[in-house]
Amino acid sequence: MTTQELLSARLARRLREARVQAGLTVREAAVQAGISNHTLIVKYENGAVAPPLDRLHDLARAYGTTPAALLAENDAAMPVIAAIDQADSAQLAHLAVALENLPASEQEPGSE
């Protein structure tokens, strides 16, 4: 499987999971996201068609999440992304300071 196919499959799975977690049917999701044809949601969730970025934003909003969470590289990152998205400016400032003060060994490889 190519990288593109893996990314498409991951996004399709996350779109379906986010919709189900939001408690929406395919038809309800289409209405919430402003999509006139609900079968497009099915195509997104099956990986047959990738949503354009503006549509991905609309879907994320309808599902109560963010495009970043839907596109996260791995599932472990999703709770962190959600917490950052919900943080206020003071919390984000504290997080930035904490990240800046991480020892080099705990930072991303190659960032030294």
Name every feature range the model reports, one short phrase each:
Residues M1-Q21:
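A short, Lys/Arg-rich alpha-helix, primarily the initiator
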Residues R13, G23-L24, S36, P51-D54:
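Residue-level signal for the short linker/turn that defines the boundary of a DNA-recognition helix
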Residues Y44-E45, R55, L71-N74:
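DNA major-groove recognition helix of helix-turn-helix
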Residues Q21-K43:
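Short alpha-helical DNA-recognition segment
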Residues D75-E112:
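Interfacial/linker helices and their anchor residues that mediate assembly or domain coupling
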Residues P52-A69:
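DNA major-groove recognition helix of helix-turn-helix/homeodomain DNA-binding modules
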Residues R16, R27, H57:
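Residues within the helices of the helix-turn-helix
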Residues R13, E17, V31, V42-K43, ...:
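DNA-binding alpha-helical recognition surfaces that contact promoter or target DNA
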